[in-house]
């Protein structure tokens, strides 16, 4: 089973996605929304990652903070302790950020082509959003669907 990328916007979504992945035995990569470093902030994203590490210690999921094109936010994320970031900057700048990441045992990631964005479930007008989110996650993690 290949690793699946799920975009989470808050702690509740991250917890639900992680729990579903564990239940299905599916590898999971959690990502912030595009430009998540500017939207959530590195400290909030790190707090979500820390919470998951405590509440789901057996989960081997990666939490990737998208820093967009902002090198400053990428460096701030690394200083905050984020271990996985995505940043779209020129090659020379990327090399400098990569060196900083390597020194902190962090990793740079590229963009992802296919991901389930849980905003679709959060924006749903259905009565039970949690059930809809779980159903979308199960379908996606099993490989039965693409981004809805």
Place the predicted regions along the sequence by residue.
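Conserved N-terminal beta1-alpha1 strand-loop-helix module at the mouth
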Residues: 1-61
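Active-site mouth loops of central-metabolism enzymes
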Residues: 2-11, 59-68, 115-128
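Amphipathic, non-transmembrane alpha-helical secondary structure
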Residues: 11-19, 43-46, 71-75, 79, ...
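Glycine-enriched alpha-helix->loop->beta-strand junction motifs that scaffold or abut catalytic
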Residues: 22-27, 76-85, 104-107
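Conserved anion-binding
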Residues: 25-27, 32-36, 90-148
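Short, solvent-exposed polar/charged micro-motifs at secondary-structure junctions
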Residues: 40, 73-75, 119-121
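Surface-exposed amphipathic alpha-helices with a cationic face
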Residues: 49-57, 78, 98-102
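Mid-chain, well-packed structural core segment of small domains
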Residues: 62-100
